[in-house]
Amino acid sequence: MEVHKETDQITDNTPTILGISCFYHDSSAALLKGTEIIAAAQEERFTRKKFDKSFPIESILFCLDQAKVNLKDIDLIAFYEEPILKWDRIYNTNLNYSRKLNIGKLFNWFNSKLRIEDEIYKNLKDYKGKILISQHHLSHAASAFYPSPFKESTIVVLDGIGEWACTTIGKGIDNRLELLAEQRFPN
């Protein structure tokens, strides 16, 4: 935090981050100031569609309203998984195990997920900033470690599946996360 002597205005240099999850199940958004969660919501709360996978525009608007900010105040948007790595798993798994690929479903997934940055900019026209694409298990680790009171922690992520990883072990120290080992699909 800085105080500008000329204006006595306080400037907070802590980044404001909008996290987005969509196009799979349980679309949601969360707004953070640094590592503090300011607001979070799942899209189904607003649409009343169970497991809603659409772009979480209502959740985003809710988070912005709760934090009393607009898209121009957002320093970074984070997306929860690396689509190209997930595409690699889906394509190779289906290619190896399915005699008849559902090309339509794969195309729809390809169109929305692999072009997620375009989708975000299209749906959030006022946002001109950066987009961070994070590995799925790193997203889980960050969501648990950063808001915790711990400066150091062992991290274990047990998940149905991320891009390829089903289980990941790592560590968090201060503001750093390191994933050390993973068990990959299909094992």
Where do the model's predicted regions map?
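Short acidic/glycine-rich loops and adjacent helix/strand connectors
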Residues: 1-187
